[in-house]
Curated annotation (Swiss-Prot):
This is Golgi to ER traffic protein 4. It is found in: Cytoplasm. Present with 5350 molecules/cell in log phase SD medium. One of its GO terms (cellular component) is cytoplasm. Gene3D superfamilies: Tetratricopeptide repeat domain (1.25.40.10). The keyword Transmembrane helix does not apply. Belongs to the GET4 family. GO terms for biological process: post-translational protein targeting to endoplasmic reticulum membrane; protein insertion into ER membrane; vesicle-mediated transport.
Amino acid sequence: MVPAESNAVQAKLAKTLQRFENKIKAGDYYEAHQTLRTIANRYVRSKSYEHAIELISQGALSFLKAKQGGSGTDLIFYLLEVYDLAEVKVDDISVARLVRLIAELDPSEPNLKDVITGMNNWSIKFSEYKFGDPYLHNTIGSKLLEGDFVYEAERYFMLGTHDSMIKYVDLLWDWLCQVDDIEDSTVAEFFSRLVFNYLFISNISFAHESKDIFLERFIEKFHPKYEKIDKNGYEIVFFEDYSDLNFLQLLLITCQTKDKSYFLNLKNHYLDFSQAYKSELEFLGQEYFNIVAPKQTNFLQDMMSGFLGGSK
């Protein structure tokens, strides 16, 4: 498209958006919605995808700001259709556009989970990330947490950015502190989520950092008896009364070494925990030590199923 034609189209698009905004301000939501969709359809049919995307995304944003969640989310779904049709790749601009929309979504919006699943499916399809874009995950996790979708938020934080990792630790720590009667095993229930989930996705760095933050908070709040010991160059916080926390720390280090004999010795030494975490250890045995499990366990497949809205 030559510059003059491009400028003309941009001017026309600007006028369309201005008329749309005027209808929104007047409360004429239905007509605004139908008119915008009709014009966007023309852009899509002529393969003017950039203009369609700009029109649809701005329209969705305006509806969300006007607290018209139904129309806003309808346009988000349409935007994702155009993203797919135009094969829009994951980059700073395409993700930022979605992040702006997520920020405006009401946490109680009935379509929230479907919108998020659609966004993430696009980022899986058009990025190098197996589970989708981490930056998008960070924003999604925060919005889900606003809506009290704690388990869903956990999944997205786990696969997000470094900031997401901090939020994930905060989430689990706050969760633990809400427990009325904390028993010895209660702490490990929450701590194990960090260790196992990061090991499942082979994020050793976040596993170590989240472990350190969590245990530091645990020591500061509950004052358990402990000593720090060096294990082959790795530091372990050895707890006198929390052997499950010791086991989980040693498991992390063992997976990092990828030494099969260490793994088997660890399981034999902590037989109770080996049984309690049987499925998780079978999967880690497959992933880190090439130990074929009697029954194949695939936590990553389960995770992917959850991301894709239940599909395999």
